Amino acid sequence: IFTLDTGRHFPETLDTLFDTEGKYGLRIRVMYPDAAEVEDLVANDGIYGFRYSVDARKACCEVRKVRPLNRALNGAAAWVTGLRREQSQGRAHVHFATYDPAQKLIKLNPIADWSLATLEDYVATNKIPVNALHAKGFPSIGCQPCTRAVAPGEDFRAGRWWWEQGDAKECGLHSRPTAITA
C-alpha cells in the first residue's frame, strides 16, 4: 500500500494518513517527488507557476505525482484505485478492470459504480478514517494550492484547478486505459 506526498498537501490530508496507519496498524509507503526535479521546476516556473497555463500545471503534476507513481508501480502486476464514475465527466466510463498501457499493468477500480451515498455509508459503517476537509465542502482533495471547496450542486471536481476552463481536469495519474472484457 502506498500514497503520494506531493509536498503541497493540506495538513488534514497528512492527518488522515497517520489516522489510517493507526487504525489498521500498518505502515503506508509514502512516495515523494524527486527533490532535484521539484527544485528545477520551482526555479524555472516559480512557486505558483502551475497557474500560468495548463501545460505548466501538468508539468507540476508530472513531477510531483506522475513520476512518483511510476516509481511506486515499477514491477507491479496490478494497481487498485478508488476511481468512481460519479466523480466527473472524464471518469463516467471507468471500468472495474482495465489494462493500463502506460503502466503495463492491470488497473482495478472496485468502487467504480459506487455513488457518494454508498461510499459514505460504507465509510461510516466500517469507521474508516476520513479527511476532515470532506465535511468542509471538499469532495475532491489534491494539493493545497490547487484545491478549493465547492458550492452545493457543483461537480465533485470543480474545486480542482478551478482557474482552468473545461471539464478535462486530471493530473495525469489516470490515463484512458483499455477495458478488459470477458
Predicted feature descriptions by range:
Residues 1-182:
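Nucleotide-activated chemistry modules centered on ATP-dependent adenylation/adenylyltransferase
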